[in-house]
């Protein structure tokens, strides 16, 4: 037992020195932060650089995701094109919705599920209604992939819907601008 006493004493002294050093550094850092303009400037620059790096990382991640979705959608549509025959559209719709629902339940199959839902959307007569249903019923990650796919390659029925929304927005902006001029 007499041998453990010096070990414990050494451990206690080492712990006390480490705690005192950490406290001293914290006090020094706080003093520099409060009183040194150069130190504050360096801290602000580091914070700006960190924010810029994070923004670049987010942008790069979005670009990679967009590229991945573009390649996948192109490959998927080349492998299984959307039918143009009206009689096949209903069967295509039900098949793709069923496959999309089945795939959405599996982890890691979000992109495949989104492509099935996208194909169903392309043959559906009222895409706005179906998008609303998708938004309420499928997981958010899959819905985001569907929106990306629509942005990459808008189907004909969705393109007319999007153009209608953009056109009405442009018309309302023109009316608002005309009202501002008259004042």
From Swiss-Prot:
Keyword Transport found: yes
GO cellular component entries: mitochondrial outer membrane; mitochondrial outer membrane translocase complex; mitochondrion
Keyword terms of this UniProt record: Membrane, Mitochondrion, Mitochondrion outer membrane, Phosphoprotein, Protein transport, Transmembrane, Transmembrane helix, Transport
Residue spans crossing the bilayer: 9-28
A Gene Ontology molecular function term of the record: mitochondrion targeting sequence binding
Compartment(s) of residence: Mitochondrion outer membrane
SUPFAM superfamilies given in the database record: Mitochondrial import receptor subunit Tom20 (SSF47157)
Domain of life, per lineage: Eukaryota
Membrane-protein topology: Single-pass membrane protein
Modified residue annotations for Phosphoserine: 172
Ranges facing Mitochondrial intermembrane side: 1-8
InterPro entries found in the cross-reference section: MAS20, Tom20_dom_sf
Cytoplasmic side: 29-183
Acyltransferase found in the keyword field: no
Single Gene Ontology BP annotation: protein import into mitochondrial matrix
Pfam family of the protein (one): MAS20
Family membership: Belongs to the Tom20 family.
NCBIfam families per record: 3a0801s04tom
Leftover remarks: Present with 5680 molecules/cell in log phase SD medium.
Oligomeric and partner information: Forms part of the preprotein translocase complex of the outer mitochondrial membrane (TOM complex) which consists of at least 7 different proteins (TOM5, TOM6, TOM7, TOM20, TOM22, TOM40 and TOM70). In the complex, interacts with TOM22.
Role, per record: Central component of the TOM (translocase of outer membrane) receptor complex responsible for the recognition and translocation of cytosolically synthesized mitochondrial preproteins. Together with TOM22 functions as the transit peptide receptor at the surface of the mitochondrion outer membrane and facilitates the movement of preproteins into the TOM40 translocation pore.
Designated name of the protein: Mitochondrial import receptor subunit TOM20
Species in which this protein is naturally found: Saccharomyces cerevisiae (strain ATCC 204508 / S288c) (Baker's yeast)
